[in-house]
């Protein structure tokens, strides 16, 4: 699968090295991106692999607005995230893609996606009951559907932030609706 993905562009390469089990990591210019898979990301997770490659190259389109990206960059690390997925899960890609984007934005965040069907003994040892299940440094952080903001809030609560890394956002409004009538609903 990785060879086929690499054959799509002369800017992508696939190198093999000896190791235990099925695992691959994404590198950019030879440097780790913080994104790895212990899975064959087919099915719903194929888009997660492609977006991770695009995000690592700066071409991704699934990043949130600048203020949210600044919050991700301000997370105190190191943070080691592991997400257990099923390749048939329709909620898993949203969580995987959000956490991969966070790993791209903050070098202190590492995210590994694990196919629970391949690593059943690990799933049983951790008592994973549903997918996606996100573990932060070995402790359960989140289970089930989740969006970028929800996952970021949980990471901020657990690891804290460096407030100096966040710029204050001033919002100006042209119109303010006051009252509880039909226009205020």
Where are the model-predicted features located?
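Beta1/beta-strand and adjacent pyrophosphate-binding region of the FAD-binding site
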Residues: 166-183
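Local sequence-structure signature of Cys/Sec-based thiol-disulfide redox active-site neighborhoods
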Residues: 1-3, 72-113
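Extracytoplasmic thiol/disulfide redox context detector
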Residues: 1, 6-14, 45-80, 110, ...
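Thiol-based oxidoreductase modules, predominantly thioredoxin-like and allied folds used
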Residues: 9-19, 107-121
